[in-house]
Amino acid sequence: MYAIVKTGGKQYKVAEGDLVKVEKIEGEPGSAVALTPVLVVDGADLTSGDKLENVAVNAEIVEHVRGPKIRGMHYKNKTGYKRRWGHRQALTVLKITGIK
């Protein structure tokens, strides 16, 4: 069985036992979180829409990590202006423990 959940402005297809990297969620490693809203649940048949108001995906926070370095640069021609920047997104690794 799988479900599609929305967290951090993105949608993830998850199944029980999966490890998923999502946008940072506050909490200590080892604590439990419930992911809502659930958009789709697929068991014996496909379920979506208003029937999923009481459905949640339970997960456990495994660790907090940082994503890969993204580098960028601003450059203005003929003025000597250059600016380099970098960014590493804060991520949380979740282990999906159940879909209820």
UniProtKB/Swiss-Prot annotation:
Keyword RNA-binding among UniProt keywords: yes
Gene Ontology CC: cytoplasm; ribonucleoprotein complex; ribosome
GO BP terms, alphabetized: translation
Molecular functions per Gene Ontology: rRNA binding; structural constituent of ribosome
Signal peptide: none
InterPro entries registered for this protein in UniProt: bL21-like, bL21-like_sf, Ribosomal_bL21
SUPFAM superfamilies in the record: L21p-like
Claim: NAD is one of the keywords in the record: no
Cysteine disulfide partners in this protein: none
Keywords, ordered alphabetically: Ribonucleoprotein, Ribosomal protein, RNA-binding, rRNA-binding
UniProt-listed PANTHER family: 50S RIBOSOMAL PROTEIN L21 (PTHR21349), LARGE RIBOSOMAL SUBUNIT PROTEIN BL21M (PTHR21349:SF0)
Function: This protein binds to 23S rRNA in the presence of protein L20.
Subunit structure: Part of the 50S ribosomal subunit. Contacts protein L20.
Protein name from the UniProt record: Large ribosomal subunit protein bL21
